Amino acid sequence: MQKEPMSKYGYEKLEKELEHLKKVERPKVVEEIDIARSHGDLKENAEYHAAREKQAFIEGKIAELGDLISRAQIIDPASYEHDSVKFGSCVVVEDLESEKQSTYTIVGVNEGNLEKGYISINSPIARAMLGKKEGDDFKVRLPKGESEFEIISIEYKALEF
C-alpha cells in the first residue's frame, strides 16, 4: 500500500470533506431517493434515477477519501533540511529555453493550488524535481512537449492555505 504524503492541513481537509459527505450529503440523497420512490413507477422516474446516480457518486467519493486517509502520511516539512527537493520544498526553477523563472512548492495530492504555486507531489514536474539539488538540470514532458529546467534555489517556506 503506497503512502500518500500530505500536510496536517491536507489531512484535516480530507477528514472534514469525508465527514460532510457521510453526515450531510449521504442522508440528503437517501431522503431524495425516498421522495422520488414515493412518486410511483420507478422505471420512468427521472428524479429517482438522478438521485440514485448522485448516491453512487457520493458513495464512490466516500470510498476514495477513506482510502486516501488510510494511506495518509502526515509530514511536517519544517522538521527537515531542504538541501534537495523534497515534500514541502519551495523550488525556484528556470526554463532553460525561455529563461522564465517559476516558483513551485511541492504539496500533497489534495493540496495543489496553481495560483499559489503549490503542485502535487504526483505531478510530472514535481516527480522530475524530487531529489535534485540547486544547480541540477532536469527534463520533464509537459503538454507542450519536453522542457528542460534548472533548479535555481530550494528552501522551506511555511504553507499558507
From Swiss-Prot:
Q: Which UniProt keywords apply?
A: Coiled coil, DNA-binding, Transcription, Transcription regulation
> Does the UniProt entry include the keyword DNA-binding?
yes
Where exactly are the transmembrane stretches of this chain? none
Establish whether keyword Phosphoprotein is in the entry: no
Q: Which superkingdom?
A: Bacteria
Q: Which GO terms describe its biological process?
A: DNA-templated transcription elongation; regulation of DNA-templated transcription elongation
Q: Give the molecular function GO annotations.
A: DNA binding; RNA polymerase binding
Briefly state the protein's biological role.
Necessary for efficient RNA polymerase transcription elongation past template-encoded arresting sites. The arresting sites in DNA have the property of trapping a certain fraction of elongating RNA polymerases that pass through, resulting in locked ternary complexes. Cleavage of the nascent transcript by cleavage factors such as GreA or GreB allows the resumption of elongation from the new 3'terminus. GreA releases sequences of 2 to 3 nucleotides.
**NCBIfam families on file:** greA (TIGR01462), PRK00226.1-2 (NF001261), PRK00226.1-4 (NF001263), PRK00226.1-5 (NF001264)
Supply the name of the protein.
Transcription elongation factor GreA
Task: List the source organism.
Answer: Campylobacter lari (strain RM2100 / D67 / ATCC BAA-1060)
**What gene codes for this chain?**
greA
